[in-house]
Amino acid sequence: MKNMEQIDFVVTWVNNKDVDWCKRKSEFEKEYNIFQDLNSEERYREWGFMKYWFRAVEKYAPWVNKIYFITEGHVPNWLDVNHPKLVHVKHEDYIEKQFLPTFNSNVIEMNLIHLKDLSEKFVLFNDDTFINDFVKQSDFFENNLPKDTGIFSPLIPRENSLTPIVLNNMEIINKYFSKKKILEQNFSKFFNIKYGKHLLKNICLLPWSDLLGFYNSHIPVSYCKSNFLEVYEKEYDIFNLTFKNKFRNKNEINHWLIRYWQLSSGNFIPRNINFGKNYAISNDPTDIINELKFSKYKIICINDGESIDSFDEVKDLMIDAFEKKFPEKSSFEKK
């Protein structure tokens, strides 16, 4: 049995400049009536920040056990795939052949149940989420439970949002959990001073008997693999339906379902709401550059803005900021 203190990181990456990948994606787009709001080009856009993700991990979280780097097959030309802590995983290594190729991040992430050597405790990153300051294992897990924020938040339908998918998640959560019992059993985990002003959300939603949704901070999520397996066994059909979708679809689920399950089960330890922050890249990335410079938050998400007029200019500014923060190569980079 693996040491329960081991914590793995999982990060997914796609290279939208890979000619073969782009060709396959284009061919399947012609076959499927895809939802453009869930599959816009910005959702695949590669900014060239990945090497700084590894530099940040090596500097700020050297205690990590293994890093599972999941891709369609391609790897950055600077990456040393023989690094002892790095496990390069191709989609074909853990996703059933019948579901490949896939251009759906939900398929890639929900199939983590089939990643055999993954530790019981792991943190799931997207390639736009970065460690921004020194972190400890206890920032992600405590007493073998994931750290998280138990904050309720009603779903608000918006254009180009994940709301339909999140609604599917919540339908399953309400099927298995009672809000009344959740609060009776774990009141202090949902009404916790660490949530600051967000406590008002939980107070305001007290009159509603059903779970209307959870607050999503868009930062890396701490997971127990056993929770993935538990939900998979109970809701196999919706997992399988999701796996069949080559592109994101409004009828599927995403990994937040497992997060909501952990929260609803009380299988988490409250974490300060200011642990991380989500930023959206815009034509003026000054706020992100300042965050990289001063490290107010330990974890940040740098979300691709869908209306950037000067992509190359903004990209250069961002890379310059990353280079100033992490000027030294990591051991994950080729010599």
UniProtKB/Swiss-Prot annotation:
Q: Which InterPro entries match?
A: Stealth, Stealth_CR2, Stealth_CR4
**Can you cite a GO biological process for this protein?**
polysaccharide biosynthetic process
Give the matching Pfam families. Answer: Stealth_CR2, Stealth_CR4
Q: What is its EC number?
A: 2.7.-.-
Enzyme class name: transferase
The source's superkingdom equals: Bacteria
Other information: Stealth proteins are part of a protein family that is conserved from bacteria to higher eukaryotes. Family members were first identified in microbes as proteins that help pathogens to elude the host innate immune system. Microbial stealth proteins are involved in the biosynthesis of exopolysaccharides. Stealth proteins are predicted to function as hexose-1-phosphoryltransferases.
Q: What is this protein called?
A: Capsular polysaccharide phosphotransferase WcwK
A GO molecular-function annotation: transferase activity, transferring phosphorus-containing groups
Per the record, the similarity remark reads: Belongs to the stealth family.
Keywords linked to the UniProt accession: Exopolysaccharide synthesis, Transferase
Keyword set includes Cell membrane: no
